[in-house]
Amino acid sequence: MAKVQGKNAAEKENDDGLREKMIAVNRVSKVVKGGRTMSFAALTVVGDGDGRIGMGKGKAREVPVSVQKAMEQARRGMFKVALKNGTLYHTVVGKHGASTVLISPAAEGTGVIAGGPMRAIFEVMGVRNVVAKSLGSSNPYNMVRATLNGLRNSLTPSEVAAKRGKSVEEILG
């Protein structure tokens, strides 16, 4: 199983201003009557460095083709996360399958304190200060999905105020 994670993860910036990062490449096999058919499954994340993030997975007989498919899927599925000075507005919990991630905002100068696939997500998204903890399964796919689910559920103070029918000043105290 060839996994690419952490500092070794392939990262590049395109001419369209998007940062791409490959999180994992797995060799998978399909058993057929004539033997095993080998192919590769790639997991990637794409971000613009300003709060937009998307993840994709691609599968093909060759590694470059699977990575390319994953990048295309990630570009199509991008969504916006509200950031405040390079960090989040509040603590969020994300779940997917057996993976649970706890993501907390951090003060300026803290840096990205997160492991594995979560670090790649925050780097391409443009988050500079965050503390994240992975609980449960450390499967890269589940961790990425759990992180994105948590980020999707984050709200700005104005959104919280609108939900509660109060003003932003009342929410912030």
UniProtKB/Swiss-Prot annotation:
Residues 18-81 form the S5 DRBM domain. InterPro entries: Ribosomal_Su5_D2-typ_SF (IPR020568), Ribosomal_uS5 (IPR000851), Ribosomal_uS5_bac-type (IPR005712), Ribosomal_uS5_C (IPR005324), Ribosomal_uS5_N (IPR013810), Ribosomal_uS5_N_CS (IPR018192), Ribsml_uS5_D2-typ_fold_subgr (IPR014721). GO terms for cellular component: small ribosomal subunit. GO terms for molecular function: rRNA binding; structural constituent of ribosome. GO terms for biological process: translation. Keywords: Ribonucleoprotein, Ribosomal protein, RNA-binding, rRNA-binding. It comes from the Bacteria. Part of the 30S ribosomal subunit. Contacts proteins S4 and S8. NCBIfam families: rpsE_bact. PANTHER family: MITOCHONDRIAL RIBOSOMAL PROTEIN S5. The N-terminal domain interacts with the head of the 30S subunit; the C-terminal domain interacts with the body and contacts protein S4. The interaction surface between S4 and S5 is involved in control of translational fidelity. With S4 and S12 plays an important role in translational accuracy. Located at the back of the 30S subunit body where it stabilizes the conformation of the head with respect to the body. Belongs to the universal ribosomal protein uS5 family. This is Small ribosomal subunit protein uS5. It comes from Bordetella avium (strain 197N).
